[in-house]
Amino acid sequence: MIIKSAKFMSSATKPGNYPPPELPEIAFAGRSNVGKSSLINSLLKRKKLVKTSSTPGRTQLLNFFEVNESLVFVDLPGYGYAKVSKEMRKKWGQMIETFITTRKTLHGVVLILDLRRIPGGQERENLAWFDLNNIPVILVATKADKFSRQRQLAQQKEMAKALGIPLDVIHVFSAKTGQGRDELWESILDLCEIDDFEQGDDDNV
């Protein structure tokens, strides 16, 4: 996948601060410390565009990134971090729900899971909520490099069983090795109804 340009646009907490709704958008959601920032950086072939942190719950805003002047990635705050107050978790939840249910240019959500962890009730509730609101979802299991290919498949099967979904619905991904990057891009572009990005050399910075 050719990345000609990728840049930070703005951060927001409410609709009045969102960028103009001019390009198709894909949001990225997942538990705190699931590897969301690393996944986005890997997709964009940028090491530090999206700030990574060893402290879960660091992302507290909706962060918008323009890619190839063709689409926008939206980094959502992570969920499930116990040390964040209930009031803050509620605030984040309302902020995310408002964005997902009202943003007309949102084409779908990449829901990020950790391949090392079998999903539970929170993930099933999330999928049910997205389905109820007619939000297309791309499921991605990160940190695949922690397992052999055989073990990856075994974990993928367990995750699919826990979520009650077909095995091939889950993308297996590694930000470290690039495994699954092209396949995930294909799903994203398909969801955004973009044939392909402009061909050329990656403009890495």
UniProtKB/Swiss-Prot annotation:
Domain EngB-type G: 22-194
GO molecular function term, any single one: metal ion binding
NCBIfam families: GTPase_YsxC, small_GTP
Highest taxon, organism lineage: Bacteria
Name of the featured protein: Probable GTP-binding protein EngB
InterPro entries documented for this protein: G_ENGB_dom (IPR030393), GTP-bd (IPR006073), GTP-bd_ribosome_bio_YsxC (IPR019987), P-loop_NTPase (IPR027417), Small_GTP-bd (IPR005225)
HAMAP family hit by this protein: GTPase_EngB
Assigned keywords, A-Z: Cell cycle, Cell division, GTP-binding, Magnesium, Metal-binding, Nucleotide-binding, Septation
GO cellular component: a single term: cytosol
Chain positions recorded as GTP binding sites: 30-37, 57-61, 75-78, 142-145, 173-175
Record's function text: Necessary for normal cell division and for the maintenance of normal septation.
Annotated binding of Mg(2+), by residue: 37, 59
Gene Ontology BP term (one): division septum assembly
Pfam families registered for this protein in UniProt: MMR_HSR1
Record family assignment: Belongs to the TRAFAC class TrmE-Era-EngA-EngB-Septin-like GTPase superfamily. EngB GTPase family.
Cofactor annotation: Mg(2+)
PROSITE patterns linked: G_ENGB
